Amino acid sequence: MCGIVGVIGNQDATQVLLRGLERLEYRGYDSAGLYVNDQQGHDHLIKRVGRIRVLSEALDETVSGTMGIGHTRWATNGRPTTANAHPHVSNDERFFLVHNGVITNAAALRDAYLQDVDLVSDTDTEVVVQLIAALARTGLTAKVALQQTLGLVEGSYAFALVDRLDPATLYVAKNQSPLLIGLGDHFNVVTSDALAMLDQTDRFVALQDGDLVTLTADTVTIEQLDGTPVVRPAHTVVLNDGDAEKGPYPYYMLKEINEQPAVMRRLVARYTDAAGQIQLPAALMRTLQTADRLYIVAAGTSYHAGLVGAPLFEQLAGVPTEVHLASEFGYHQPLLSAHPVFIFLSQSGETADIRQVLVKVKAQGHPTLTITNVETSTLAREADHFLTLAAGPEIAVASTKAYTAQIALEALVAKALGAAQGRAAAADFDVVHQLSLAASGQQTLIEEADVLHAAARDLFATTRNAFFIGRGVDHAVSLEAALKLKEISYVQAEGFAAGELKHGTIALIEQETPVVAFITDPLTAAHTRSNAEEVAARGAKVFRIAAHDLARPDDQLQLPPIDARLSPLLTIIAGQLMAYYTSLDRGYDVDRPRNLAKSVTVE
Ligand code: F6R
């Protein structure tokens, strides 16, 4: 949520910042700005409402420099206006600041320290930059003023600060919001996500909470707030720079939908040996085997992936498994079992709702595993154990390949745990074969995109609402399919347990209401079919998606074969593609839906 970038050294700062901001746009895109300084007495501050493209159009060749900071915003405090866009500048025009996070005591700080300062924005960030300037006016150096300010602020932040009087130095600080330093040759960069600076360097230092960093072109000095020096290791981020490009696809979302078969195969290759045996870290296996109950904690799409994973852990490994929304769990923790193990599912690894749970359960002494796509992320670093989704960067705001990768990895872990415990159910489940069926089945469905486009047109072109129904994992996938449609096409969509419709919600069914029914569970297929009939009898336009062995000739889509427990790996491809085409046909920006951001770093 919000992306920040910075650069200092021998680079064309404007271009480095702009390109970085374009790649961070997934974190927020309601306004953007940058400040550059040529270290020879000239500087520029440019801010615009709207996308990075709008900012870019506002720049000409005079806006150049060798150091600077940039920001793309997802509004928290104050509407998306030019005044509220970052960088914020102190009234004496000495300090320039970009911020990702939320300062929770901004109002109190303003009342206590800034009574005589006129604020020009509604943001918490402006309070911080004015406070730094006010402290500097008392004779403190920029660094000490920043240090003292950090001692006063409460909340989350990744800050990058420029002191116009000393443009050979860039200051950054971090608490609860992600921030990395990228190491270059006579330059250094700052970024919320390594992805944004991969064209500059592949060597990154992930900062930790409480770090205050002083950067010059050739030095990186990291201290804690009390001035104690700390050394943080640099990691090489192995990512093909091209992974972050759209290539021939019109939208990242379509590219990422199309990548799913490859992601399935890559996951199998990553977590199995030549004999097809699952290989997970021994320490993780020991931890998992202590669990008398697993608690999967996640948000949004990742929560939906957890709902699909829970029955796998129960059936294959015999471990009772609960799935919880992170935003609820942290503040209303249920009574835990005697030996809980926590699994955090997260595409970004930065979700604040999840992190607050991680911090709490770690303090309670419970073992933790993070499954995420971003190896350098906070949740990956802070949990006891970490497994990568290895899905490659997911840029579109609507999550697709991370969801299917999460389910596939849950299946691999559940199988490994069941096998380690000698369970027959695990022995009978050939997960490697099933994931290979998933990959080929996904490919088949992707090749039927035209059919799904036509279905999307027929069902959703003009509708204001829609329903997705199913039972068991079909209910879980209904929630995810509805979320996909909602977030990128703004259709009011509901995922519903098929059997619950008749208990009230069926009252919403009218002539032509679109209802997609998922039928992959042999146990309940007949019941779900009856529920689909019931809505059709009340005028609904029903689209049935049925498993290979349950399909009837008049079902609109028949799935390729797969174990019913993994059917969401196929059914969701239909959901994703229908949502994609609906958004496209309605003329929306598929990758950047309104009001959203990909990395949700505020509670
Ligand atoms: C929807 C989507 C979100 C995220 C949610 C949690 O397409 O991506 O619902 O799943 O914000 O984010 P992560 O998975 O990064 O923890």
Predicted regions and their residues:
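Conserved short alpha-helical segments that host acidic/polar catalytic motifs at enzyme active sites
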Residues: 1-246, 250, 262-269, 273-292, ...
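Active-site phosphate/pyrophosphate-binding segments
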Residues: 260-264, 268-295, 385-514, 586-603
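Glycine-rich oxoanion-binding loops at beta->alpha junctions
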Residues: 66, 70-83, 271-286, 309-345, ...
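Acidic/histidine-rich
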Residues: 153-187, 460-487, 522, 529
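Glycine-rich, anion-gripping cofactor-binding loops and their flanking helix/strand elements
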Residues: 180-202, 206, 327-361, 500-534, ...
